[in-house]
Amino acid sequence: MASELRVDKIIPTSGVATNGSGGLVQTKFTQIRLSSASTTSQSFIDIGLHCSITPKFSTSKIMISVSHYYWFQSNSESDYCVATIYRDSTNLGDGNLGSNATSGTNTSSQNSMQWYPAANPIAAYNNGFSFEFVDQTHNSTSELTYKLYMRCNASGSQLHYSWVGQMKHMRLQEFSA
């Protein structure tokens, strides 16, 4: 019996096909349990969740996936938890919140990625959020560190972003362009 081998492409050991695009190159993951923490700041603060990756290609795309928790001090608060991702010292939030905007304009001057409501009357309950963002502009093969930043939108609110035992995580995936 004669054998026949037919393939559309051969993927090298580096994980990316020659002239291929969209292939997963690598994944990095971090998860943390922080002690109890909160803020009243209306300026973005680094909340301690970060992950680093060294892209193999300067043209690749980095998909950032985040899962986190938040809640406010009081059930009657009507504030927003505002979140964004920094790549090293660059805020990747452009203020275009799409359907997550707080008004009908779909834009914001807040340089953020996500706004999460206090959800009055359950603002003091533990609220979880997750979101994904694709960084298409890193243009680097040096190590990149992505960090989650959060803040209150209004003064007078106390935003809790960590509690003992709660797991938060960030995943970075590099895809070939």
Give the residues covered by each predicted segment.
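Glycine-rich, low-complexity segments
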Residues: 2-38, 177
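Extended, low-complexity regulatory regions
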Residues: 49-51
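Terminal beta-strand-rich extracellular "head" domains
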Residues: 30-31, 36-39, 43, 55-143, ...
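Short, solvent-exposed loop/turn segments enriched in Ser/Thr/Gly
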Residues: 45-47
